[in-house]
Regions:
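Transmembrane alpha-helical segments of integral membrane proteins
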Residues: 139-149
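Membrane-interfacial helix-loop-helix
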Residues: 1-8, 33-126, 151-163, 174-204
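Hydrophobic alpha-helical transmembrane bundles that constitute the permease/transmembrane domains
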Residues: 108-112, 132, 136-140
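Short, amphipathic, aromatic/basic-enriched membrane-interface segments that mark the entry/exit
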Residues: 15-21, 100, 128-136
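Re-entrant/interfacial helical elements at transmembrane boundaries that shape
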Residues: 19-33, 112-120, 146
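Transmembrane alpha-helix interface/packing and boundary motifs in multi-pass membrane proteins
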Residues: 7-23, 171
């Protein structure tokens, strides 16, 4: 994947409304784990992830600032649901600017928090402060944790692919379970699945 890939994933997950499904936490942990084996450089991983995350949040802020309330009118789809916005909005109203920092460690909310900060016209200087602080805290803590555990359990490097796969599954599982439990998501999937089957059955 490389450092550019790490930065890219951190950027998309933080800055795009459809990036919430990307496994940012597990990516940083796995990158730190690989760094402990000398496969990649820990400092460069942190720099790449930090830049991607901070720039992504800034993009999300500008998106919300320019679109304003239109964000709340976006139609539901398989990869976007208004409930994600509402969940992040409730969290933002409760914690204010600190949401930008706290949300770094909360999948889904992490993606929508900067957008809501833009919609709410948070003072940009305050947003930048929380954004940089949260980005540093997130990237350093997760990559260093992976690095430390990689040093404690060096034999796990022989099974690195299984370790990464396991981390991704654990990271993505809560989101997938939430999707399956959501009635509107299930109805959306059923509707489009039936349309797909009908299209395949229709004569040419």
């Amino acid at each position: 994947m490389g450092y550019a890939g790490i930065a890219g994933i951190a950027f998309v997950e933080s800055g795009f409304l459809v990036g919430f499904f990307l496994p940012g936490d597990s990516l940083l942990f796995a990158a730190g784990f690989l760094a402990s084996a000398g496969t990649i450089d820990l400092e460069l991983v942190i720099i790449a992830a930090f830049l991607g995350a901070v720039l992504g949040d800034s993009f999300g802020y500008m998106l919300g600032f320019r679109l304003g309330p239109k964000v709340f009118k976006k139609e539901n789809s398989f990869i976007f649901h208004k409930s994600h916005i509402e969940r992040a909005q409730n969290f933002y109203e409760k914690h204010g600017g600190k949401t930008i920092v706290i949300a770094r460690f909360l999948p889904i909310i992490r993606t929508f928090a900067p957008v809501l900060a833009g919609v709410g016209k948070m003072k940009y200087s305050a947003f930048v402060f929380y954004n940089i602080f949260g980005g540093l805290l997130w990237t350093i803590s997760l990559t260093v944790l992976g690095f430390i555990l990689g040093g404690i359990f060096p034999n796990l490097h022989n099974y690195i692919l299984f370790v990464i796969l396991g981390i991704i599954i654990i990271s993505v599982a809560p989101t997938m379970i939430g999707v399956l439990k959501n009635k509107q998501y299930r109805e959306y999937i059923k509707k489009h699945w039936k349309n797909l089957l009908n299209t395949q059955k229709s004569p040419e």
